[in-house]
Structure formats: structure tokens, C-alpha cells
Amino acid sequence: MARTALKVKAKRKPKFKVREYNRCPICGRPRAFLRKYGICRICFREKALAGELPGVRKASW
């Protein structure tokens, strides 16, 4: 889990646009962020397996 200070820091508008970075709103993880869904890979997997993401299915071939 990310520190609360880092979560708050990421939400603030930076002085320069290039300093902005994505962070998972659920757990605060800055890496492995999926832009399409707006969450990190770990939270994505948990939500997908729980059926909370519409249109997402486990791959099978």
C-alpha cells in the first residue's frame, strides 16, 4: 500500500504538466497502471475475477 502522503501528492495539480503521473485510486500503486480502466493491474485482476468490470472475461483458447 502506498503512503497517504504520496496519494495526496499525486492528486494535487503539479506546477508543470510533465510532473503529473498516474496512480491507482484504490490502492495507490504508481506502477502497472492500466489507463483504459484507470486502475493498477492487481486491482484490475481482483475486480475482473469478481465480475465487477463489465465486458472483461478471462481468456480461453
Curated annotation (Swiss-Prot):
Q: Which SUPFAM superfamilies match?
A: Glucocorticoid receptor-like (DNA-binding domain)
> GO molecular-function annotation terms?
rRNA binding; structural constituent of ribosome; zinc ion binding
List keywords of the entry alphabetically. Metal-binding, Ribonucleoprotein, Ribosomal protein, RNA-binding, rRNA-binding, Zinc
The positions annotated for binding Zn(2+) are C24, C27, C40, C43
Q: Which Pfam families match?
A: Ribosomal_S14
Matching entries from Gene3D superfamilies are given as: 30s Ribosomal Protein S14, Chain N (4.10.830.10)
InterPro entries under this entry?
Ribosomal_uS14, Ribosomal_uS14_bact, Ribosomal_uS14_sf
Q: Which cofactor does it need?
A: Zn(2+)
Q: Which GO terms describe its cellular component?
A: cytoplasm; small ribosomal subunit
Q: Name one GO biological process term.
A: translation
Its job: Binds 16S rRNA, required for the assembly of 30S particles and may also be responsible for determining the conformation of the 16S rRNA at the A site.
Q: Which family does it belong to?
A: Belongs to the universal ribosomal protein uS14 family. Zinc-binding uS14 subfamily.
Q: How does it assemble?
A: Part of the 30S ribosomal subunit. Contacts proteins S3 and S10.
Q: What's the protein name? A: Small ribosomal subunit protein uS14
Q: Which organism is it from?
A: Maridesulfovibrio salexigens (strain ATCC 14822 / DSM 2638 / NCIMB 8403 / VKM B-1763)
The encoding gene: rpsZ
